[in-house]
Amino acid sequence: MTTTLEQLRAGQLAGTRRLTLADGLSEFPREIFDLADTLEILDLSGNALSTLPDDLPRLRKLRIIFASDNRFTELPEVLGQCSQLSMVGFKANRIREVSGKSLPPLLRWLILTDNEVEVLPPEIGACSQLQKLMLAGNRLRALPEEMAACSRLELLRLAANQLDELPAWLLCLPRLAWLAYAGNPFSEALAASVLIDTPIAAIQWNALELEAQLGEGASGVIYRAALSARHDEASRPVAVKLFKGAVTSDGLPDCEMAACIRAGDHPNLIPVVGKVKDHPAGAHGLVMELIDPQFANLAGPPSLESCTRDVYREGMRFGLASVLRIAYGIASAACHLHRQGVMHGDLYAHNILHGAGSEQGSVLLGDFGAASFHIADNRDFSDALQRLEVRAYGCLLEELIERCDGLDANVDIAAKLVALKAHCLSEDIGSRPLFDDIAAVLRPLSGAGDRDTAALAAV
């Protein structure tokens, strides 16, 4: 909840652990230090700040600081003196300089999205607790080799920078599971060729009638719409995603659109009907099949506390049959994507739609905002990327197993799932299976082989 400076000055916030101030501040309010004994989370986003006070470490319990959408041109060095600070968020400033002195010793999560950073300090390699690093929309031309020591790094966003290559050591980080790098010079040509070379229907804007807004994310807004048909046919319900065009924490909307198009058809992906043509404001958009409202997200996104792991509804449980179908469906979809030269980059339960009611057991992988492209024929590179994403899949499988009913009564299946999870999460990257290996293990367990046989027999 946003509070006011007047409330702070009146002493109404004594004892608070979380403070949010967005009052057009150009200077750090000294009254914040009255909360030094309790304040843990400080959010100063959406102000006009360019500096922080030298005595910021007086906030001795401060764990998290947000200062996005301000006027900082450098990451304040005083942050490095805050002994308990683990999360630092300075998105959408004008930051060019990041000093090694600005990195706190317990840094776990650093957000520098949409700034002007050209160089990261070598001291980042000493951030032994670093798990999540958000750098999309900067001017980085290289990464410091010292980052190879960041053995706990799990999620890395590098999209929309100036990188000419991914360093070899990056794909050797033992816990890296979620990577996005689209919109860099070394990958731009692949994304551009998708938009030119991949066949997709063009749908005139005037053939669409927007109805209710279904949702909004960082990259765009999704609407329910009616797609006009020929005069002798009724219009059909569809979903339309109109992209915003600005850089997001994951990357560029144009790259997301290209990935959706390149993904093609698969039973566990949301079908794309076509690309919007002749929008009056020139906006880019996709027309997709409308998903049955019985589908819901499998989980919520990570919290400030969980950092890289999704948050499930309390008490949420899955039957064994559902777990097997989800696990197989997502492995099959990921295998298909990598064959198409697409790495999803955000393979998480919160990006998976799970059916209920008549759709029970059905599963769809969505949200391509962090997707990146690779040449599938470059086996060494593409296999390395795939094994990286297999670790993300292992995290998903671990979460499903933890919430699965019926394992005690199916000891053999339980043993196979636990062993598969362990292989996917192995820090010996070369020993991890590829997605087709995973699908081969799960296909007979999930009954997918029987369904495939039945489908072929019906043809």
Language model regions located:
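Structural motif at the C-terminus of the N-lobe alphaC helix and the adjacent alphaC-beta4 loop
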Residues: 258-269
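The feature captures the LRR N-terminal capping module
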Residues: 1-54, 58, 63-77, 81-111, ...
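ATP-binding glycine-rich loop module of kinase domains
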Residues: 220-258
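Short beta-strand micro-motifs within the conserved protein kinase catalytic domain, predominantly
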Residues: 271-284
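Conserved short submotifs of the Hanks-type protein kinase catalytic core
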Residues: 281-295
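Catalytic-loop of the protein kinase fold
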Residues: 334, 338-356
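Activation segment signature within eukaryotic-like protein kinase domains
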Residues: 326-327
